[in-house]
Amino acid sequence: VETPISKVQGASPTSPMVDQTVSTVDVVTATYPTGGYNGIYIQTPGSGGTPKKATDASDGIFVYSTWAAAHVKVGDCVTVKGTVREYHDLTEIGGSTQVDRKSGCAPVKATELATLPATDAGREAYEGMLVKPTSGYTITNNYGLNQYGQIGLADGNTPRYQGTEVALPGRGAEAVEVANKAK
């Protein structure tokens, strides 16, 4: 029995299916054969393109599989069987994961977003999904780039500064941090 990714993800930060074995048929949207990820992202065929509400479940998920990362490519239709788990606040399918190529999946679309969701719940609705920012963003943090492939983005053309980068410790720095949280 196939389980849709949205059911695996659920509408809360933690999957309702943790420690359960699932099988799902989806489209590969990213592969990470090097750099420590050792896996792929998959998304429900035909999904994407429409913005989600914070209460919606995501249609994408990470699959921890060294074999898959080296043998499938973006756009492939795959059957994935493995165990649902949470890893550093990320829902993934892992364990003794089985990934097989197949045919017949409708392509996925990137969901265009003028602004990225500001809340954890808003971002959770897009966890693991293909998104396409459509407005201007500035890289504001690259600390996790080499290890995790992550960059921090800020809306507009101004990076977010740490309070003490632009003000002395105390009220001035605190005001900068308050302004950052409001963005």
Name the predicted role of every residue range.
Residues 1-183:
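Extended non-catalytic accessory segments flanking core domains
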